Amino acid sequence: MLQQRTIKTLTRAVGVGLHSGQRVELTLRPAQPDTGIVFRRVDLPEPVDIPITATAVVDTRMASTIGAGGAKVHTVEHLMSACAGLGLDNLYIDITAEEVPILDGSSASFVFLLQSAGVELQNAPKRFIRVKRPVEVREGTGQQLKWARLEPYHGFKLRFDIDFAHPAVDSTGQSAEFDLGEGNYARDIARARTFGFTKDVEMLRSSGLALGGGLDNAIVMDDYKVLNADSLRYDAEFARHKILDAMGDLYLVGKPLLAAYSAFRSGHAMNNLLLRELLAHEDAWEIVTFENERQAPAGFTQPVRAW
């Protein structure tokens, strides 16, 4: 039987929110089988639980925000991406503010924390959402066109194409692909950082966003080049970060997907719209388990290796 996973022991992190600039503490705790991943706002007078689901997403402006009972947690996608990459099914995430810490702008620190806590197999079958037919969402036309698509696939793979007219992006690549069964999430995707442009920073900060952003937790570019002293971590780091984000956004459906995801100029809003479109058509998906691990798709049977 392909089993569910949680962590063996609790682990903690402290940082600041990318957009809020607030100091925040995270405590990641093991959870029982079939719990799912649950954020808990422990800073409120009465703690509020926010289980991840596609419909728990309440805002997608610059990040994925989930909410329940009047409480919200912003910028969950990097932590969710790490959970997806490591195949974690059950986890409590206690948080002391309204935004997940940005740490270094990637998922690498979350992967390190979770792997340090250890991955534990649980005596319950791992449940997948298997996509049975293509589902697509589109927006705009011509230069404004963007789209995202899920198609049947015995495994989980992603392709993302971006479209940024910038020398640094052009020189490293406008597209990236990742197959969970062939690649290594920790090595190939997790270290890709969020990115932005100096020309946008003032506008974002005037809107109360990017207050915690800087060269230590994002790739920052002027009109011509990357400003970070350490330059880039990957070829096509920009497109790889979009894959990282997409993995986190899609994991908000609450179960791992068996599907091929492809997208052009998509973002948090379109990724969530794609999940809602999938769930709205019951003939397009089904819940499956694997009693025989040999029949399970590659990438889900073994815990992700370290770097």
Curated annotation (Swiss-Prot):
Keywords: Hydrolase, Lipid A biosynthesis, Lipid biosynthesis, Lipid metabolism, Metal-binding, Zinc
Pfam families reported for this sequence: LpxC
Enzyme Commission number(s) from the entry: 3.5.1.108
Names of the cofactor(s): Zn(2+)
Enzymatic reactions: a UDP-3-O-[(3R)-3-hydroxyacyl]-N-acetyl-alpha-D-glucosamine + H2O = a UDP-3-O-[(3R)-3-hydroxyacyl]-alpha-D-glucosamine + acetate
Family listed: Belongs to the LpxC family.
Protein name: UDP-3-O-acyl-N-acetylglucosamine deacetylase
Gene name as annotated: lpxC
